[in-house]
Amino acid sequence: MASDLLFLPGEACFAAALPMLIKTTFPDYSVATYAWIGPALGALARWAGGWIADKLGGARVTILSFIGMAASIIGVITFLPSGGDGGNFPGFLACFLAAFVASGIGNGSTFRQIPVIFRNQHLKGLTEGTPEYARALKQTETESGAVTGFTAGIAAYGFFFIPALFANFAVTSAMWGFVGFYVTCIAITWWFYARKGAESPS
């Protein structure tokens, strides 16, 4: 699932990036004062993401979360110091917090998407109450549970991914890489899960 990849440059990634960027690009501001806000907002947004996905559909909400993250990171880039400009910390922080919220919403919608995708794949054309339906339902639960666990596990790599990325690339270049990644995920999610006639609508 493309939406599984949300968790690589997503909430955990942002949780690693925000304190690093405050420390290196806005050293006059305290990391301890601001770094906790983003993860807290992201955690609250997860519930909202699941609820909204129930109303609008998981794929649609996941795409909107990718759009929100891309727009937020472009805002972060805009407010970073560049050249002789010292940057704008309030704008930087607001955009970064918006990225956390968008990622949290995508987190919630992705976990709503996963079982729907497997149900659509395995139960299509089967009659409820038949042995075939029962076997397919059990297979659906097994596979969706495994993918859910795998998806959650990906998040842990964010804490390794960010320091390695910033050690090898300029901050602005890395951020533009995030934007490109989100655009790619939008296209993949739309093609496989959201468009009319999609392979696995969710």
State the predicted function of each range.
Residues 45-58:
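Helix-to-loop junctions at the C-terminal end of transmembrane segments
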Residues 1-43, 107, 111-112:
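Extracytoplasmic gate region of multi-pass secondary transporters
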Residues 177-202:
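Multi-pass alpha-helical transporter architecture, strongest
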Residues 39-47, 156, 160:
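Residue-level signature of mid-helix packing/kink "hotspots" within the transmembrane helices
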Residues 125-170:
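A late C-terminal transmembrane helix in Major Facilitator Superfamily
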Residues 59-110:
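C-terminal transmembrane helical hairpin of 12-TM major facilitator-type secondary transporters
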Residues 164-182:
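A membrane-interface helix-boundary motif in multi-pass transporters
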Residues 105-135:
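Intracellular juxtamembrane helix-capping segments at the cytosolic ends
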